[in-house]
A protein has these predicted regions:
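Nucleotide-sugar donor-binding/catalytic module of glycosyltransferases
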Residues: 1-160
Length: 160
């Protein structure tokens, strides 16, 4: 029940990103069961050639991939704010260069947003890996009042 909602995904990358830890997270975005109609990949300063080549290879296959290039490193906050302003869609999925998304992440989240129009921000629980092995599971509260109560002490979102 995705209702043909269009959405954007943003993926910031900086020079410190390792190719081997980047490839699987990047492909987990590309191979989603519900693909974004716009994937903004933001190069925050110069990036490694092998990462650039991989992205350009996929860009040749998928017309929804757009590259935004900042010549010098501006920092994650700046890059995310710029990316949000450049997105063409109401819904925006934030992705990290080291986070692997389950194949139907976008489908689940877009369906949830379609059914719950009062929702402004949506996150999820996460499983943390260390050396490709289970490290911990981070569960967040789903109760609105608990989220509000946590705001002064911690970020109630795993991915923000």
């Amino acid at each position: 029940m995705t209702n043909n909602y269009k959405f954007s995904a943003i993926l910031p990358i900086y020079r410190g990103v390792n190719f081997h830890t980047f490839k699987k997270p990047f492909e987990s975005i590309i191979n989603q069961t519900l693909k974004p109609n716009e994937l903004l990949i933001i190069f925050d300063g110069p990036i490694k050639n092998n990462i650039r080549k991989l992205i350009e290879e996929y860009q040749g296959k998928y017309n929804f991939i757009k590259i935004i290039n900042f010549p010098s490193n501006r920092g994650l906050g700046y890059v995310l704010n710029r990316a949000v302003k450049l997105c063409k869609n109401k819904y925006i999925a934030r992705c990290d260069a080291d986070d692997i998304s389950i194949p139907d992440r976008f489908k689940i989240q877009i369906n949830y947003l379609n059914k719950n129009h009062k929702i402004d921000v949506l996150g999820s629980n996460i499983i943390e890996l260390y050396d490709n092995k289970f490290f911990s599971k981070k569960k967040m509260t789903l109760i609105h009042e608990n989220i509000i109560n946590q705001l002064n002490f911690r970020n109630p979102m795993n991915h923000s």
